[in-house]
Amino acid sequence: MNTIFKQKNTHPFSNAANRLDRLPISRVHFQVLTALGIVYFFDLADLFTLSNVAPALIEHWGIPLSTIANVTAASFLGMFLGASLGGRLSDRIGRKKALNLFVFVFSIASLCNAAAWDIPSLMTFRFLTGFGVAAAMVITNSYLAEFFPSSVRGKYISFCAMIGLIGVPITNIVSAFVIPLGSWGWRLVFVWGAVGLIYFFFIHRLEESPRWHENRGEYAKADAILTRIEEQVEKEKGPLPAASQPKVSETVKQNAGYAGLLKGRNLKITIVLSAVWIFETFGFYGFASWVPSLLKSNGVTMENTLWYNVLHSVGAPLGALLGSMISERFQRKWILAASAFLTAIAGLLYGMTFIPIMIIVFGFIVNITERVFTSNLYAYTSEPYPTEYRSSGSGLAYGLGRFSNIFGSLLVGFIAVQLGYISVFLFIGGCWLACSLLLIFFGPNTNAKQI
């Protein structure tokens, strides 16, 4: 089934996009979802370990909210560097090799968090965890965007996010049980984050991205991978339809760098996506990272805070499931704009009550609408860029969002201490409203476009 084409410029061409696009969803695709779903699961779980542990650190180490802000800032500095450098590295050495490296980094770093003996050591380990987590997330989304057919790309990226978001309530439940065990209980939460190493039992299911090989001019390698995939799909689904002919305008671009993200059409995409990720990060982590500490600082017991967090987070996988179901039914920019607006409203209402049932209800709604947003944003961020810029571009946008939260964490801490509890939620709501407006006026349409 070798189908290496010749273009008018005499370069051979493996036609990866068209060959992948005409494949029916099969066992091969679900094997990819399983392996990358594990990455998503522990990647997202690790993002929430610190917010769960923070009230225990305040109680057992006697530290103020401002110190938690510093630890959080270190995490986001690591995320910025991980997303920016990890995406670039995967463009150079391949999606699979880079993903293996960074899953190992964030899993081992999470285990090291459990051994932290003071704030500087915890900040160091959180920096390394953030570095690995963000790099792995960017690479996972690039791989999914390049592997799944364009007609269902967003649906399955959102579905993978749903698998990952199941890790959020499970992590919160683990935290609620182990943290109260004693002054050492919080350390077990970080041990849980290291279980992501089980990914390495599934890496044999992953091929290198054939589109990455093709973009480097390694047509024979791309064709060999595509042929193996096609043979597996044919055994399960029967004969495949012929792939469309490659476009003669497609050429090899192996040495794309960051400078190309600031030129032509890429410049607008980079500005819009970076701004959306910055406001999303302020809004998302302003809520997720700070709510447990804010509730405890306003008189809610640590046990109640942990269980409120569990009940809130049940909405996370439900939101991602809903996001997956509607991802291809509407343009993603409008799904994103609407869900950001609803998150702004629910977040504001959350900050206006201390009635337990209302805290649970509004927190649950925030988790649903925010996860509809996030699960579609991961797909949306990977789509507008051409292959040679995909990981670098999405990594830069994602990374700038994480970098901004170095200051966002300090800003939320300042607002909480100086302006009060409700002011934090006014800030969070404003960030989500800014996301909505940016997407309405400047977001590109991306659904079902071949990338």
Curated annotation (Swiss-Prot):
Keywords: Cell membrane, Membrane, Transmembrane, Transmembrane helix, Transport. It is found in: Cell membrane. Residues 1-29, 82-97, 146-157, 204-270, 327-333, 379-396, 443-451 are cytoplasmic. InterPro entries: MFS_dom, MFS_sugar_transport-like, MFS_trans_sf. It comes from the Bacteria. The chain crosses the membrane at residues 30-50, 61-81, 98-118, 125-145, 158-178, 183-203, 271-291, 306-326, 334-354, 358-378, 397-417, 422-442. GO terms for cellular component: plasma membrane. Residues 51-60, 119-124, 179-182, 292-305, 355-357, 418-421 are extracellular. Gene3D superfamilies: MFS general substrate transporter like domains. It is a multi-pass membrane protein. GO terms for molecular function: transmembrane transporter activity. PANTHER family: CARBOXYLIC ACID TRANSPORTER PROTEIN HOMOLOG. Belongs to the major facilitator superfamily. Sugar transporter (TC 2.A.1.1) family. This is Putative metabolite transport protein YyaJ. It comes from Bacillus subtilis (strain 168).
